[in-house]
């Protein structure tokens, strides 16, 4: 609990010790294939300290994996088009984030990102009235919001010719 930018703040545990063990294995594999870890990445039971991975190449297994824990991968992009290419080079597409001071760029980039949800200039902006869901291997369909309600409705078409 607490401000995530303060070292005294504590993150809650992962869903299980097994989940934390899997995260440790993923990080070890990423480092073995050339990634660099910033942060401690230490495990204590189901607790896991935050990690930032850099130097992840497309050949690194981490590039195509989901990390269910406090892990962020940081990539360097040469320009906006390259950043979009990096963002879309994944089999997953649940949520993405765009941070910019240019509102036109924010919408232009968000429109090109292949994800079910794109949040601009903020994290944790989801809400029960907004649809939630992904594309690619991150699922299909939506839950929550009007679109989510429609996922649980059976519609029937009846056509009568006279």
Which residues fall in each region the model found?
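Diglycine-centered glycine-rich loop/turn motifs
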Residues: 36-41
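Flexible, acidic loop-helix segments that line cofactor/substrate-binding pockets
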Residues: 1-25, 42-48, 64-69, 128-131
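Conserved C-terminal structural/oligomerization subdomain of aldehyde/semialdehyde dehydrogenase
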Residues: 44-162
């Amino acid at each position: 609990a607490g401000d995530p930018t303060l070292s005294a703040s504590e993150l809650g545990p992962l869903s299980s010790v097994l989940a934390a063990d899997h995260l440790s294995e993923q990080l070890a594999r990423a480092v073995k294939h050339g990634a660099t870890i910033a942060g401690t990445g230490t495990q204590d039971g189901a607790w896991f300290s935050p990690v930032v991975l850099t130097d992840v190449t497309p050949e690194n297994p981490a590039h195509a994996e989901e990390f269910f824990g406090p892990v962020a991968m940081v990539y360097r992009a040469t320009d906006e088009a390259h950043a979009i290419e990096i963002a879309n080079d994944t089999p997953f597409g649940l949520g993405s984030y765009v941070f910019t001071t240019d509102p036109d760029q924010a919408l232009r980039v968000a429109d090109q990102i292949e994800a079910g949800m794109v949040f601009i200039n903020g994290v944790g902006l989801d809400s029960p009235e907004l649809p939630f869901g992904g594309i690619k291997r991150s699922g299909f369909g939506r839950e929550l919001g009007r679109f989510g309600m429609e996922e649980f409705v059976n519609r029937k078409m009846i056509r009568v010719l006279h």
